[in-house]
Each structure stands twice: as C-alpha cells, then as structure tokens.
Amino acid sequence: MKYFGIVAIAMMLAPAESRAQQPLVVDTPFVHDPVMAYENGKYYLYCTGHGISQMTSTDRKHWTIAPQGVLRNSEIPAWTHDSVPGFTTHIWAPDVIRFKNKWYLAYSCSTFGKNTSAIGLLSNTSLSDKDGWKDEGCLVASKGDRDNWNAIDPNFVIDEKGKPWLTWGS
C-alpha cells in the first residue's frame, strides 16, 4: 500500500505533456453555409460554427480543419452581444470576398428562431494571416420588435461597374 501511495503521488506531481491542439484532416467535410476562397495555392473554406469555422486545402480533397475558429471566444466583438441578446459564439453563414487588395468576411450573429440579428464585417490583407482579422463593426442589424426581416446570410456582390454591394436573407 505504501508503494502504491508513493507511485500515485509521483504520477500526480510529474509534469504533464503539453501540446498545441492539432488540426484535424478529413476528406469529406460536413459543414453548414460554406464559402470558399483561393489564395496563393491554397483553398480556404469558412462555414457556420463557433468563431467562424475554417478549413484549408491545396487540392479540395483533403481538408485541414483549424482547431479554433477565425475568431477565438475572447475575440468575439463586444458589439455582437450588445446587438443580439443571447448570442454567444456560434456564428452563421459567412461570406468572403477580395476587393481592392483586401479580404472581407461578413458573418451573421443571431439566436435560433429570433429575428434580432446582426451582420458583422472582418478585414484582412491575407487569408493565411490567422491573426490579422480586424473587426470592422456591424454592417446592419434587425430587431424583432421593429423589423419584419432578419439580418442573416450575408452575400457580397460586385456589380458591372465594380461597386460592392451586400445582400442578406430572411
């Protein structure tokens, strides 16, 4: 019994192996509301998920799922919680576009079954710069007691004159 106690204490005091979270590689990603962009030989797929889920691939057959979303929990902009009571970290339906040498990513903040929602915007100079996303704020918001529409499902459109527009659904 004395030996067991010494071994148990030694195991508890031994340093634990610490490793960074490894990306998961899959050949068939199952996602909601995907959007894909291509930059410098790599495909970037963004989709509904906690902090905006992100995957990368060089061949569109083998996808590496990032262990954390584009926005980590601590990086979710404060305005999202102010605009959408009850919103946490589950971000919906991103859309991404390159416009004038910059990437823009629009996303929806909402709670299921409500039409108090908001569409936010992030910008970055490169999709490969995972720490370079800058919050550009809220583009549009809907309020359940005010509006009969819902600010979700953003989509960028560039017209024939090169002017950018944002459409959204619901």
What are these regions (language model features)?
Residues 1-21:
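Bacterial Sec-dependent N-terminal signal peptides
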